[in-house]
């Protein structure tokens, strides 16, 4: 049994060759790094590295107070990694990566299907050489199907996958979710797939290929709305903040702002109506049960809204919490991240950097009692881990000026 004082991550000793960029793949490899894996992030010197390094402002300052190559977007999914400057078209760099692949447990990439074949870094080639390798490919539409060669960004995946048709006001246009949820969810599915493949390898010695698509992940994330359609044949519609299967479950206006109220069962509805002074509503057959309330949503919600508008946000939250009815505020991001609850849960972490001010990023929400997540490496500057990788592989080159010049960042 592991000693409680052991602070090694659960994935300590795992080596990851990360050929991904933007958000989906980096989300996955950041999670693996948080859990203790060593992640070597490969970045192309000809393009200045990961595209998201240039997705700013804002940028973290360097030691002189100027913008560094760490955009906030890049920092959101790249802590805990070591950046390696390597051009896949360069034979020497490619040989370096082949040596790394030979020692890696996991390779993850998000090139277009077939894009790595010309470099001999595709899954068929590497898995044939290294049968225990777990190789994860992320693309917009997957390795098969009529759309396999189309590019895929988060916004496109939200559109193709149907989630935008559900998001927004009933009389408004389709809207994307406020953050890159297709990318993030795809990265989480990739993490799950990799851990499952590693478990299989532990049992059999066999690696395998994981084929994951942004659009597939987005469609899987339709959850109840997708199954509502599959069961009823009726396409779901945009309903703002309302719930397709529960009423009342929405954002409501108080006298001084907005609150969220989520009445999940009939007993909660009785207590809710007692608070708003409408004890008559649960006695009305149209509203007595959730299925009835769902049918008569349009008749119920205006009455609820009128009653709630007489109260302040604080009174609604205090009154419903006392009655054990789910209720909460609609926080801004500053309010959410600087709340007492967020501080108690380490929702943000500060990471020290050499010769530059520390950066503050979002923390990992996992709270593991024996193998806590690690927040010990800040997001890397471009190429800062190149020599460390060469040392680890036993082939660091000293005083090769031409090679050093070749890997300077291109702006």
Per-range role (PLM):
Residues 1-193, 197-203, 377, 381, ...:
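N-terminal helix-loop segment corresponding to the beta1-alpha1 unit
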Residues 46, 141-142, 214-219, 256-258, ...:
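Glycine-rich beta-alpha junction loops
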Residues 53-61, 229-237, 339-353:
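Short, surface-exposed loop/helix-turn segments at secondary-structure junctions
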Residues 65-66, 74, 239-244, 249-250, ...:
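Short Gly/Pro-enriched turn/cap motifs at secondary-structure boundaries
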Residues 143, 171-179, 202-218, 237-244, ...:
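Conserved Rossmann-fold dehydrogenase catalytic segment
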Residues 187-208, 220-233, 273-280:
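Oxidoreductase and adenylate-handling cofactor-binding alpha/beta cores
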Residues 247-323, 327, 399, 410:
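Aromatic-enriched alpha-helical interface/lid elements that frame and gate functional surfaces
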Residues 322-376:
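A glycine-rich dinucleotide-binding beta-alpha-beta segment and adjacent secondary-structure elements
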């Amino acid at each position: 049994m592991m000693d409680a004082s052991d602070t090694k991550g659960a994935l300590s000793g795992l080596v990851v060759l990360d050929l991904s960029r933007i958000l989906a793949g980096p989300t996955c490899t950041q999670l693996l790094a948080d859990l203790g894996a060593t992640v070597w992030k490969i970045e192309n010197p000809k393009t200045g590295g990961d595209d998201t390094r240039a997705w700013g402002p804002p940028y973290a300052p360097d030691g002189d107070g100027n913008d560094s190559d760490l955009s906030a977007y890049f920092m959101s999914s790249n802590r805990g990694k070591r950046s390696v400057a390597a051009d896949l078209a360069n034979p020497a760099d490619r040989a370096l990566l082949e040596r790394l692949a030979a020692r890696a447990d996991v390779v993850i990439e998000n090139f277009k299907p077939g894009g790595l074949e010309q470099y001999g870094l595709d899954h068929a080639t590497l898995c044939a050489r290294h049968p225990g390798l777990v190789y994860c490919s992320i693309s917009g539409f997957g390795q098969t199907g009529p759309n396999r060669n189309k590019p895929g960004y988060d916004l496109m995946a939200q559109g193709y996958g149907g989630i935008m048709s559900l998001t927004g006001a009933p009389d408004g246009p389709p809207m994307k979710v406020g953050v890159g949820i297709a990318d993030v969810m795809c990265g989480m599915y990739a993490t799950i797939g990799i851990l499952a493949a590693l478990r299989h390898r532990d049992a059999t010695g066999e690696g395998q290929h994981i084929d994951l698509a942004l659009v597939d992940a987005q469609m899987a994330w339709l959850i109840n709305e997708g199954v509502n359609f599959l069961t009823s044949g009726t396409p779901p519609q945009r309903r703002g903040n309302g719930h397709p299967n529960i009423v009342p479950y929405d954002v409501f206006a108080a006298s001084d702002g907005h609150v969220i109220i989520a009445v999940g069962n009939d007993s909660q509805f009785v207590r809710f109506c007692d608070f708003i002074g409408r004890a008559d509503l649960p006695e009305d057959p149209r509203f007595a049960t959730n299925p009835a309330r769902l049918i008569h949503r349009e008749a119920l919600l205006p009455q609820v809204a009128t009653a709630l508008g007489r109260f302040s946000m604080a009174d609604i939250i205090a009154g419903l919490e006392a009655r054990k009815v789910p209720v909460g505020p609609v926080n801004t991001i500053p309010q959410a991240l600087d709340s007492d609850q967020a501080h108690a849960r380490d929702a943000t972490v500060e990471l020290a950097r050499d010769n530059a001010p520390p950066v503050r990023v979002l923390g990992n929400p996992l709270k593991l009692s024996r193998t806590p997540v690690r927040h010990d490496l800040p997001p890397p500057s471009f190429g800062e881990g190149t020599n460390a990788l060469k040392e680890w592989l036993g082939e660091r080159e000293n005083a090769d000026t031409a090679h050093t010049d070749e890997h300077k960042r291109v702006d």
